[in-house]
């Protein structure tokens, strides 16, 4: 009889058991979320939390939302991920969260206008691949 379910209680057990190749993904996640890139870390955490919420992974949503709040030093208990349009975040980040939603729901639904709404705030086009990468990482982690 397999002891699989007892052995793998969390994603971390899976990573540790297969560290020779899983370590690369862990390092990728660390670089993606923590290295200075086009997006501030709190927005990357917010994207991760938003996608996790859309995917029904409350564990990841709650953790990444709290990290984002702490990075913002925001004492506001309101959840900006519930209503992006009226969220108390800078306007330039709202199109990024909207684009992240489309990446998660149906990447083929993304139109030039969606990208233009992000780029109009002076972001480099590389920010689009960064958004897609964060969404992909969240999707993977939400299903492991």
What are these regions (language model features)?
Residues 7-14, 41-56, 85, 125-132:
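Alpha-helical scaffold segments that form or flank carboxylate-/histidine-based iron centers
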Residues 47-71, 134-138:
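Short, thiol/selenol-centered motifs that function as redox-active sites or metal-ligating centers
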């Amino acid at each position: 009889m397999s002891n699989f379910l007892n052995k793998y209680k969390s994603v971390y057990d899976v990573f540790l058991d297969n560290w020779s190749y899983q370590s690369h993904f862990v390092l990728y996640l660390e670089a993606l979320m923590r290295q200075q890139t086009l997006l501030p870390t709190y927005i990357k955490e917010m994207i991760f939390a938003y996608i996790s919420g859309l995917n029904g992974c409350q564990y990841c949503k709650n953790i990444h939302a709290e990290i984002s709040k702490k990075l913002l030093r925001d004492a506001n208990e309101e959840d900006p991920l519930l209503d992006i349009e009226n969220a108390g975040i800078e306007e330039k980040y709202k199109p990024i969260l909207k684009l992240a939603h489309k990446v998660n729901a149906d990447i083929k639904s993304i139109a030039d206008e969606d990208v233009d709404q992000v780029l109009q705030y002076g972001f480099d086009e590389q920010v689009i691949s960064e958004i897609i990468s964060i969404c992909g990482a969240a999707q993977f982690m939400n299903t492991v």
